[in-house]
C-alpha cells in the first residue's frame, strides 16, 4: 500500500527503494469498486472500437471511438506481434524485437494494441489519473510543480495481444548536462486484470 508518515509525506522507505531500484509496486491502491468501474468502462469503450485499423465505424455501424479525433487514438497490431520492438518508434526505446509466434488461424487479422487519449473517452480513467493518493506520490517524487501529461492503455488480449519488450520510458534527457534521476519523470501503471 501507499504509506505516508505522520506529516503526510510519502514514506522515506518508499522513496529510497524507488531511487535505488527505479520502480516501486503499490498494491491495493485502487479499491475493488474502482477496478470494477475501470473494467466495465474499458469493455464499453472496446465495443465502440473501429471494426478495423483506420475504420470509422464500430461493429454495430456506429461512429467508432476516436473517429472524430485528429490525433491517432487506437494503434493496432497483428495478433501476437511486436510492432514496436527493434524499430525507430519512440526514438528507438524498444530496442529488442520479441519473438512473434504464429497466432491461431481463427484469430482476427488485427488486434487492438494501444489506446491513446483515453481520458477524453472515459470518466473512470480520468478519476484514476487524478486519484488523490497517486497525485500525492507524484508530488513526492516530482515536487509540487508538476504536470501529468500522458496516458496510454496497452491492450493484451489472451491469444492475440501484442508483445512489448522491456524498455525505459523517457527518451529526451539522457544526455542532458543537468541530468538527475528524476529528469524523465515516472509512470504509474494500473493493472486492470
Regions found by a protein language model. Give the residues of each.
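Non-heme Fe(II)-dependent double-stranded beta-helix
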Residues: 1-20, 27-181
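Short gly/pro-enriched beta-turn/loop segments at secondary-structure junctions
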Residues: 159, 185-189
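Short, intrinsically disordered, charge-balanced linker/junction segments flanking boundaries
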Residues: 191-193
